[in-house]
Structure formats: C-alpha cells, structure tokens
UniProtKB/Swiss-Prot annotation:
It comes from Homo sapiens (Human). The gene is CYP2C19. This is Cytochrome P450 2C19. InterPro entries: Cyt_P450, Cyt_P450_CS, Cyt_P450_E_grp-I, Cyt_P450_sf, Cytochrome_P450_fam2. It comes from the Eukaryota. CDD domains: CYP2C-like. Changing I19L: In allele CYP2C19*15.
Length: 490
C-alpha cells in the first residue's frame, strides 16, 4: 500500500478516535471549553503556568470542569470545598494515580508514587510505618536530621561569610537525610558517588519541569519514536535504579534480621516474612523503585522550600529577627534545636507554614484518578478519569488567608500570638494520596531553619526591599529566582 495512503488512514483513525473520546459521556461530565481534535484544549493552557490557566477557566466554568490534554480527559478541581469533598470525603474513590506514560515506562507500575490498587496500598502502608518507626538502627529519624543539620551548619561556616548561592548546600542536606534513612549512610558533600546522585536528581527535576515532558505524557507515541530530553530522564532513572540495586545486594549479604539498620533492611525482612506468599507485593523490584521514589520526592521539594525560605527571610528581616528572638528565648545557644521545641515556638512554626503556603511549591499536585465511576456534584466521572487538583486555589484562598499574595506569618497566628491551624494548609496535597514523607519534610524544615538561624545572621547583597521573591514557574514547580547571601556567624 502507498505510504501516503497509510499515513492518511492513520491520521484519520487518530482523528476519529479523538472525536469519539471527547464526545463520549460529555453530557455527564462537568462543563469545559470545547476541545480541538487530537490536541484537545492545549492551546487554551499556558504550559509554563498551568495553575494560572486553571484559575482563569474556573471563573468561566465553575469549581469543577473538564479539560482535554491531547486525548487525555481530565476533570479539574478548583477551590477548597471541591478539593476537600473529593480528596477527603470521597478519598477512596479519588485515590488513584493519574496516567503518566513516562513514569509507567520507567517504574513499570512498581513503587509508591505511580503505583495503584493493592500494590500501592500495601507499599504505602509499609513505608509510612517504617518512616514513623523511630527505632531503626537504634537511631531515631530526628537524630538523623539533627546530625545532618549540624553538618549543614559546618558547611555554611566554610563560606566564611562571603557571598554564596545556597542551592547546592541546601540540596545536599535533605538528600543526605533520605540516604541515611534508606542506606544507613550519609555522605560527605564532596563524595563523588553522592555528587553523581545529586546531579541525576537535579537533572531529572529540570527535565520533568519542561513543556516537552508534558507533551510526551499527552502524546506517548513520542516516547519511542522521537529524540528528546525524555530519553535522558529514562537513562538517569535507570542509572539510579541500578545503583540502588547494588546497595540492596550489599544489604542482603550483611543484614541482621533482628537489628534492621535502615529502610532497605526493613523491606528485606518483610520480604523474608512473605516469601511463601506468591501474591506478595514485597519484591526486589518494588524495593528498588520505592527507594528511588523516596529519593526523588524527598530531596528537591525540601531543598527548594529551604532555598525559598531563606530568600523570604532576607526580604523580611523583621520576621527573621522575631524567629531568632524566639530561638534565643526557648533554645538558647548551648544546645541543639529539637522537635519538642516546636510546641513552644508558635512564631517560628507560623513562619515555616507561611513559607510553604506562600511559595505554593507544587501548584497542581500530582494528578489523581478516580478508581470507579463516581457521581460528584451531579456529574458522572468515569472510572480512570484523571483528576487535576489546584492546590493554589486552596493555599491562596483570600477568605482563609487575607492578602494571600503577601508573605505574612500572621496567617497562622491567632490574636494572642498562638499558632493557628488551618484546614486550607495543603502543600502536601490531601486525602489518601497525601505525601508519604510529610512528617519528615516538616521535621527537616523546622530543624534546618532553626539550626541555621541559631548559628548565623543572614545578610543580603542588596537592599532587602529590592529582592525579587516572585516565583519562577516552570510548569511543574514554583522555584525561587537566583540569589546570593552571606551567612554571618553569630
């Protein structure tokens, strides 16, 4: 058959498939802009700032609406009420993970971030239990974070109060905490193996944040037939998995079943207990991918939040002064901060919360999916439909947070200066898919920041009023603009 005829037939089939998918069930789905064949609503979305586009569309179609990214149908949730109703009140029905062709290629359905069903539930339950087990290797997770915080302070001392970009050092600290939990080992910041790991993690975040990856996920045929950065992403992930597998083999040879040292040991012990169960989800494949998931999810998000926190503290020296006064009063100079201190430091706690609220790190979270046909607000959402959640619409709700575009710790303080919780605080998402490392991340943010401010004054290279804190939105995360500062020993 003539190649031209084959091409026309293929394009015609794709067009018909697109029209059929977009028209099927439209009477039951939430409203939304009319999609174009094949490309859907992509032309109506700013790929570099999806969150802003969703906010604009919500003003037209309401808090629940339908979009098509290519052939992929998505239902968008915008605003606290619908997000709570879906992710919390109907948590089980909305607990699936959205379709990610690239991740599915890399992870093969294993791990904790992109798995679904029984596998996801069992691996998540085990990971939560293990991360909360403060007795691994007779050292609590808090001990590990405190140790890394001391190392971080010593690295900052080496800058000798000269101007520096904190990106690298602030990236090393949370990565080392995860390494300590998974591998029972922290690395020197100049260790070549550690630097290679950091390089792969950072490069992957840069790649994932590009519009090209959005295109690959919406048109998965590209993955096999086109060159691009997605190939580098898959190569980096394969490198990390190979490295983790080597460490798993080392653990198998040296493990003491009665004295687990780290996450890998705990997983291997669980595998041993379930070795007679042919349906067990505790396999080497799941261990390797879960460890890679924890490394990827637990490094860049925390380091970016820390980097943004220091920029905001530079911009608002009056806030920094209040935090340091609270540190001096509650902790002093002669001991290290600990998590028990947080309950006695409402202002510092409010500042950490406000940093996370203000920066809105992951504006749309990772997409969910419905696990069955769901009736939601008089609409029928078919099983498997991807759910896109606007966390921006919750964290920047102007009824809950007056002047949401302003950095103001009073958003989390009552009139008496006591810490005030808010149900709208969802930087880790909400419901059954809430970030498994939430507790660890909150511990790291509090301890790293208090250790830094206990030991250093922060000095800006320019007038604080002239510092730009506008986030650089890159399609996946909101990151701070480049800046330098000086760490002046107190």
């Amino acid at each position: 058959m003539d190649p031209f005829v084959v091409l026309v037939l293929c394009l015609s089939c794709l067009l018909l498939l697109s029209i059929w998918r977009q028209s099927s069930g439209r009477g039951k789905l939430p409203p939304g802009p009319t999609p174009l064949p094949v490309i859907g609503n992509i032309l109506q979305i700013d790929i570099k700032d999806v969150s802003k586009s969703l906010t604009n569309l919500s003003k037209i179609y309401g808090p629940v609406f339908t979009l098509y990214f290519g052939l992929e149908r998505m239902v968008v949730l915008h605003g606290y009420e619908v997000v709570k109703e879906a992710l919390i009140d109907l948590g089980e029905e909305f607990s699936g993970r959205g379709h990610f062709p690239l991740a599915e290629r890399a992870n093969r359905g294993f791990g904790i971030v992109f798995s679904n069903g029984k596998r996801w539930k069992e691996i998540r339950r085990f990971s939560l239990m293990t991360l909360r087990n403060f007795g691994m290797g007779k050292r609590s997770i808090e001990d590990r974070v405190q140790e890394e915080a001391r190392c971080l302070v010593e690295e900052l001392r080496k800058t000798k109060a000269s101007p520096c970009d904190p990106t690298f050092i602030l990236g090393c600290a949370p990565c080392n905490v995860i390494c300590s939990i998974i591998f029972q080992k922290r690395f020197d910041y100049k260790d070549q193996q550690f630097l290679n790991l950091m390089e792969k993690l950072n490069e992957n975040i840069r790649i994932v944040s590009t519009p090209w990856i959005q295109i690959c996920n919406n048109f998965p045929t590209i993955i096999d037939y086109f060159p691009g950065t997605h190939n580098k992403l898959l190569k980096n992930l394969a490198f990390m998995e190979s490295d983790i597998l080597e460490k798993v083999k080392e653990h198998q040879e040296s493990m003491d079943i009665n004295n687990p040292r780290d996450f890998i040991d705990c997983f291997l012990i669980k595998m041993e207990k379930e070795k007679q169960n042919q349906q067990s989800e505790f396999t080497i494949e799941n261990l390797v991918i879960t460890a890679a998931d924890l490394l990827g999810a637990g490094t860049e998000t925390t380091s970016t939040t820390l980097r943004y926190a220091l920029l905001l503290l530079l911009k608002h020296p009056e806030v920094t002064a209040k935090v340091q006064e609270e540190i001096e009063r509650v902790i002093g100079r002669n001991r290290s901060p600990c998590m028990q201190d947080r309950g006695h430091m409402p202002y510092t706690d409010a500042v950490v919360h406000e940093v996370q609220r203000y920066i809105d790190l992951i504006p749309t979270s990772l997409p969910h999916a419905v696990t069955c046909d769901v009736k939601f607000r008089n609409y029928l959402i078919p099983k498997g439909t991807t759910i896109l959640t606007s966390l921006t619409s919750v964290l920047h709700d102007n009824k809950e947070f007056p002047n949401p575009e302003m950095f103001d710790p009073r958003h989390f303080l009552d009139e008496g200066g006591n810490f005030k919780k808010s149900n709208y605080f969802m930087p880790f998402s909400a419901g059954k898919r809430i970030c498994v490392g939430e507790g660890l991340a909150r511990m790291e943010l509090f301890l790293f920041l208090t250790f830094i401010l206990q030991n250093f004054n922060l000095k800006s290279l320019i007038d604080p009023k002239d510092l730009d804190t506008t986030p650089v939105v890159n399609g996946f995360a909101s990151v701070p603009p480049f800046y330098q500062l000086c760490f002046i020993p107190v």
